[in-house]
Amino acid sequence: MAIPNDSLIYKANKEYSEGLYNDAIENYLKVIDNGYESSELYYNIGNSYFKINDMASAILYFEKAKNISPNDEDIIFNLNVANSKIADKIETVPELFYVRWWNTFYNLFSVDTWAKITIFIFILTLIFASIFFLSSIKNLKKLCFWFGIILLLMSIFTFGLSSQKYYYSKKYNEAIVFTPTLTIKSSPNKNSVDLFVIHEGVKVLIIDKVDNWYEIRIANGSIGWMPCSAVKRI
């Protein structure tokens, strides 16, 4: 008989507070196996892995938590701490100021939240449209018309954001390196030229896949190929 998620989470939280981090991880992962996920759950798993000094796994689950709650300060702080513990300190490619502003706005919410915002704004648009068509008051009709237009444009904009984030999440997948030392190759072949070396815990962006090889890009813009088995996808 399956144990309810609430009981598993309660048990895992208790084990964590008692310093039984491996047991806590086991029970948290059972909750995920049951089909449940939340930023808090992933955050707790990340903290548990951090306590046993498994930084790659900690970063993986902090990143999963961040994908759901991108503005959570605790998640961001712990993720930064975990990243400071790994071997590689990769400098990110500088962004133009308007690109940085756009990315900040774009990443304010998860894809689900942007979708909910779109639905809410569209419902408001329909309400103003209904008042416009049903009202006989000239000034009210004019007000509802312009508000309706503005809200319609906003709903199109937020729908575009939601769709773009969803498309990005499907086409481009981020992953964490789980191999202690990994040599990145120039092509999807173990006999190809060595390009550079990265280590466990580094986040990579998967941009292509050929057989059992991923083409990846790291934060400084460097691109190369690695075996699929070397990473776990976020």
Q: Where do the protein language model's features map onto the residues?
A:
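Membrane-embedded alpha-helical segments of integral membrane proteins
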Residues: 93-133
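Boundary regions of SH3-family modules and the immediately adjacent low-complexity/disordered segments
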Residues: 55, 142-179, 186-189, 193, ...
